[in-house]
Curated annotation (Swiss-Prot):
Native source species: Homo sapiens
Protein name: Protein FAM3D
Tissues/organs with expression: Abundantly expressed in placenta and weakly expressed in small intestine.
GO BP terms in the entry: aorta development; negative regulation of insulin secretion; neutrophil homeostasis; neutrophil migration; positive regulation of macrophage antigen processing and presentation
GO cellular component term, pick one: extracellular space
Compartments it resides in: Secreted
Length: 224
């Protein structure tokens, strides 16, 4: 091998060794020396979580008060829901709601659920509703939510029974109106827990139906 070839080989080896030493000495790093920018090193931003209380309320009810939330049905598509003291009494998921009037009875002192039933007010027999309303026990709270059509089969007797429970709108209830209500047996005066929307082409949110109603809050035992 010529001397020039040997020199080239030595030069190449020297360059490789020198480069390797340079990399090792100056470009090596450890994780301890890495400093991330503050915006990268900062711990992830915590999601803001809104604490919810019984029946999804954003504020807790006072001691000895009952939490409730009632939603009417949306058109003839989504059924109503009734929650009382964090118990879902009626809902589409429980498969115990129906077209017309959905009614739950609750003990006004203990909050215990006494029963629930749906009444078809479009093609059903209104006398089933009348019988049910007449048999409501004393001291019971009456929770009502409409779905689709709550008013077609209503008669004077059923309207009076609801009025006696504290309703201000039972006498006006008609075809496809939206209505949510909490009343009580032997109530003196009118209930403060009631919402009503008339079915009107000028104000309806859905085609042929008014907007669903949502009523929530807290009530004391024997609130009326």
């Amino acid at each position: 091998m010529r001397v020039s070839g040997v020199l080239r080989l030595l030069a190449l080896i020297f360059a490789i060794v020198t480069t390797w030493m340079f990399i090792r000495s100056y470009m090596s790093f450890s994780m301890k020396t890495i400093r991330l920018p503050r915006w990268l090193a900062a711990s992830p931003t915590k999601e803001i979580q809104v604490k919810k209380y019984k029946c999804g309320l954003i504020k807790p009810c006072p001691a000895n008060y009952f939490a409730f939330k009632i939603c009417s049905g949306a058109a003839n598509v989504v059924g109503p829901t009734m929650c009382f003291e964090d118990r879902m009494i009626m809902s589409p998921v429980k498969n115990n709601v129906g077209r017309g009037l959905n009614i739950a009875l609750v003990n006004g002192t203990t909050g215990a659920v006494l029963g629930q039933k749906a009444f078809d007010m479009y093609s059903g027999d209104v006398m089933h509703l009348v019988k049910f309303l007449k048999e409501i026990p004393g001291g019971a709270l009456v929770l009502v939510a409409s779905y689709d059509d709550p008013g077609t089969k209503m008669n004077d007797e059923s309207r009076k029974l609801f009025s006696d429970l504290g309703s201000s709108y039972a006498k006006q209830l008609g075809f496809r109106d939206s209505w949510v209500f909490i009343g009580a047996k032997d109530l003196r005066g009118k209930s403060p827990f009631e919402q009503f929307l008339k079915n009107s082409p000028d104000t309806n949110k859905y085609e042929g139906w008014p907007e669903l109603l949502e009523m929530e809050g807290c009530m004391p035992p024997k609130p009326f």
